[in-house]
Amino acid sequence: MSESSSKSSQPLASKQEKDGTEKRGRGRPRKQPPVSPGTALVGSQKEPSEVPTPKRPRGRPKGSKNKGAAKTRKATTAPGRKPRGRPKKLEKEEEEGISQESSEEEQ
């Protein structure tokens, strides 16, 4: 019994070693670490003075979904300033406007 358990543990150890060194080929390959300048060839080196521009993010930023409520402010007009845009109707004015329209139709 002890012999069979020791035999089974040996193949498992060899499998783990193979997995560590052997590439599986699934998914995206890992990014290779940058090569140190000492090992790189002199002819293929880029100029150190050249600084690449950082990539700008595309599209909508991630955290901008639910910020509409925080940015909105009340539409209060300061005294002496005219309100911009179309004036808002109050509930009373709406009711009066409807009653005036119906009375105009009768006449």
UniProtKB/Swiss-Prot annotation:
GO terms for cellular component: nucleus; senescence-associated heterochromatin focus. The modification ADP-ribosylserine is found at residues 8-9. There is a cross-link at residue 15 (Glycyl lysine isopeptide (Lys-Gly) (interchain with G-Cter in SUMO2)). The modification Symmetric dimethylarginine is found at residue 26. Keywords: Acetylation, ADP-ribosylation, Chromosome, DNA-binding, Isopeptide bond, Methylation, Nucleus, Phosphoprotein, Repeat, Transcription, Transcription regulation, Ubl conjugation. The modification Phosphoserine is found at residues 9, 36, 44, 49, 99, 102-103. Residues 93-107 have a biased composition (Acidic residues). The modification N6-acetyllysine is found at residues 7, 15. GO terms for molecular function: DNA binding; nuclear retinoic acid receptor binding; nuclear retinoid X receptor binding; peroxisome proliferator activated receptor binding; transcription coactivator activity; transcription coregulator binding. The modification Phosphothreonine is found at residues 39, 53. Isoforms HMG-I and HMG-Y can be phosphorylated by HIPK2. Phosphorylation may modulate DNA-binding affinity. It is found in: Nucleus; Chromosome. The keyword Transcription applies. The keyword Nucleus applies. Residues 1-107 are annotated as: Disordered. The modification N-acetylserine is found at residue 2. Residues 21-31, 53-63, 78-89 bind DNA. Its main location: nucleus. Residues 55-74 have a biased composition (Basic residues). The modification Asymmetric dimethylarginine is found at residues 26, 58, 60. SMART domains: AT_hook (SM00384). Residues 53-77 are annotated as: Interaction with HIPK2. Belongs to the HMGA family. HMG-I/Y bind preferentially to the minor groove of A+T rich regions in double-stranded DNA. It is suggested that these proteins could function in nucleosome phasing and in the 3'-end processing of mRNA transcripts. They are also involved in the transcription regulation of genes containing, or in close proximity to A+T-rich regions. This is High mobility group protein HMG-I/HMG-Y.
